[in-house]
C-alpha cells in the first residue's frame, strides 16, 4: 500500500491510497468468505461458492465488497493523526491488479495563542457582596425565628396563615387533603395565597381551576391566623440561632464566613465562564473552510432530526444569517477546545483516576445515586469518563489562565451604575 498526500488546505488533507496485487487478493478472499455466508447461487452449496463464480455473478458488487475490505487497512495509517472529523472517502476504484482510494481527512487545526493578559474578567466586590449576604441572612433568621401569636382579626401582610386544602374533581370526589402554611407578603399575588388576604379563622375559600380540560375545586379552610413578630437584631437573636453565639458580632462573623465560601466558589466559576467566552478573541487558527462547512451541515442536520431547525431559523433574518452565526459559534468552540488541549499538553496538566473518582462523588447527589454507584458508573462507561476528564482538564487550565488575566472589580448588581471598576491584577 502506498500513501500519497495529494492536497493540503490548512487542517484539511487529501490522501491517495494505492493498493497492490497482494493486498487486493487478500481483500478478495475476505469478500469471498463474507459473501459465502450471505448469498446463494443455484448449483453451488452455500458457503462453497468459488471466488471466480462470485466475481462473475456479482460483478461490480463484488468489487465494492473488495474495496470495503481494502479500506479496513486505512484506519491504522491515520492513528497518529488527531482528527476532528471522520475520514471522508471521495473516490475509490478497483481495476485489475490495482486499487485506488482517495480520502479527505480533517486534522485538529493548529492554533496560535495570543497574550492572555489582554483578557479582562469581572469580579464582584467581595466586601460589598458579603455585607449584603450577612444582611440578607440575618433577615432570613429573623423570619425563621418570628414569634407567632394567634389573632382573631383578618389575615394581612406579614401574617402567617395555616390552611387545610382539599381538592375535588368535577364529580365532587375528594382527591387530596393537606395542610399548608403561607406568609402573606405585601402586594400578594400568588395563586391561592392572594385569596386568603382578609380571611379569618374558620373562613372557607373555594377556587375553581381547570387543567388539561378538567375542572377542579380547591377548598381552603383557614385553621389559624398568626401575627408574626420578628425579633430585634441584637445579641438575643444570635443566642436564639445557636447557643454557641453570645453576641450579634459572633453571628455576623459566622455568616460572613459562610458567605465567603459561597462567594469564592461562585466567583471562580463566573470568572472561568467569562474567560472561556473571551478566549477566541486572542486565538488565531488554521482551519479549512471545508471543515467548517461540514461541521455546520452536521449541526443543521442534527437540529432537523430533532425537529428544532425551523423554529430556530425563524428568529433570524434568513437561513444564511443563521448559517453564518452557527459557523462563528462552531469556530469559537473549536478555538476554545484547542487552547485547552494545547495548554494542557504544554503545561503538563492531566487528570488522574483519583480526580475522576472525586468528581463522581461530588456529582452523585445531582445524579440521584450513591457516591459508590457514581464511581462504578464512571469506571464502566468510557464516554462518561471522558466527559468528566475533559470537564476537569478544562477547569484546571482555566484556573491557571486566571492567574494571568486582568481582573476588574465591579459593584454588585443593583448598586451604582456602569462606572469603571478597579483592577485587581
Swiss-Prot record:
* Cellular component GO terms held in the UniProt record: cytoplasm
Q: Name one GO biological process term.
A: protein transport
Q: What is its main location?
A: cytoplasm
Name the protein family: Belongs to the FKBP-type PPIase family. Tig subfamily.
NCBIfam families, alphabetically?
A: tig (TIGR00115)
Function per UniProt? Involved in protein export. Acts as a chaperone by maintaining the newly synthesized protein in an open conformation. Functions as a peptidyl-prolyl cis-trans isomerase.
Q: Which protein, by its recorded name, is this?
A: Trigger factor
The gene behind this protein is: tig
Amino acid at each position: 500500500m502506498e500513501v500519497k498526500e495529494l492536497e493540503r488546505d490548512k487542517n484539511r488533507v487529501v490522501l491517495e491510497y494505492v493498493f497492490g496485487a497482494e493486498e487486493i487478493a487478500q481483500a478478495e478472499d475476505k469478500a469471498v468468505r463474507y459473501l459465502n455466508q450471505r448469498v446463494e447461487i443455484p448449483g453451488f452449496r452455500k458457503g462453497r461458492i468459488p471466488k471466480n463464480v462470485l466475481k462473475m455473478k456479482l460483478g461490480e458488487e463484488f468489487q465494492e465488497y473488495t474495496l470495503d475490505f481494502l479500506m479496513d487497512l486505512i484506519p491504522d495509517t491515520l492513528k497518529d493523526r488527531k482528527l476532528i472529523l471522520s475520514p471522508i472517502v471521495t473516490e475509490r476504484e478497483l481495476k485489475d491488479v490495482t486499487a485506488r482510494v482517495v480520502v479527505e481527512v480533517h486534522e485538529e487545526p493548529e492554533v496560535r495563542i495570543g497574550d492572555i493578559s489582554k483578557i479582562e474578567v469581572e469580579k464582584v466586590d467581595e466586601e460589598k457582596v458579603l455585607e449584603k449576604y450577612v444582611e440578607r441572612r440575618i433577615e432570613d433568621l429573623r423570619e425563621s425565628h418570628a414569634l407567632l401569636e394567634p389573632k382573631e382579626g383578618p389575615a394581612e401582610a406579614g401574617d402567617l396563615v395555616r390552611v387545610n386544602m382539599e381538592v375535588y374533581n368535577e364529580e365532587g370526589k375528594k382527591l387530596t387533603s393537606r395542610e399548608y402554611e403561607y406568609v402573606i407578603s405585601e402586594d400578594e399575588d400568588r395563586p391561592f395565597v392572594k385569596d386568603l388576604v382578609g380571611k379569618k379563622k374558620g373562613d372557607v375559600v373555594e377556587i375553581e381551576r381547570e387543567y388539561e380540560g378538567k375542572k377542579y375545586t380547591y377548598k381552603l379552610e383557614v385553621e389559624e391566623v398568626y401575627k408574626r413578630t420578628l425579633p430585634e437584631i441584637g445579641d438575643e437573636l444570635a443566642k436564639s440561632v445557636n447557643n454557641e453565639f453570645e453576641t450579634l458580632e459572633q453571628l455576623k462573623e459566622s455568616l460572613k464566613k459562610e458567605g465567603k465560601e459561597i462567594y469564592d466558589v461562585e466567583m471562580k466559576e463566573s470568572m472561568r465562564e467569562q474567560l472561556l467566552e473571551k478566549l477566541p478573541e486572542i486565538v488565531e487558527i488554521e482551519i479549512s473552510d471545508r471543515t467548517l462547512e461540514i461541521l455546520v451541515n452536521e449541526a443543521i442536520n442534527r437540529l432537523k432530526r430533532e425537529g428544532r431547525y425551523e423554529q430556530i431559523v425563524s428568529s433570524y433574518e434568513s437561513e444564511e444569517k443563521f448559517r453564518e452565526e452557527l459557523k462563528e459559534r462552531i469556530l469559537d468552540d473549536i478555538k476554545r477546545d484547542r487552547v485547552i488541549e494545547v495548554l494542557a499538553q504544554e503545561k503538563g496538566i492531566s487528570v488522574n483516576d483519583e480526580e475522576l473518582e472525586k468528581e463522581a462523588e461530588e456529582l452523585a447527589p445531582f445524579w440521584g445515586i450513591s457516591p459508590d454507584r457514581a464511581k462504578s458508573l464512571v469506571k464502566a462507561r468510557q464516554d462518561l469518563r471522558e466527559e468528566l476528564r475533559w470537564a476537569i482538564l478544562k477547569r484546571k487550565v482555566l484556573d491557571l489562565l486566571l492567574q494571568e488575566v486582568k481582573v476588574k472589580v465591579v459593584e454588585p448588581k443593583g448598586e451604582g451604575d456602569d462606572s469603571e471598576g478597579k483592577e485587581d491584577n
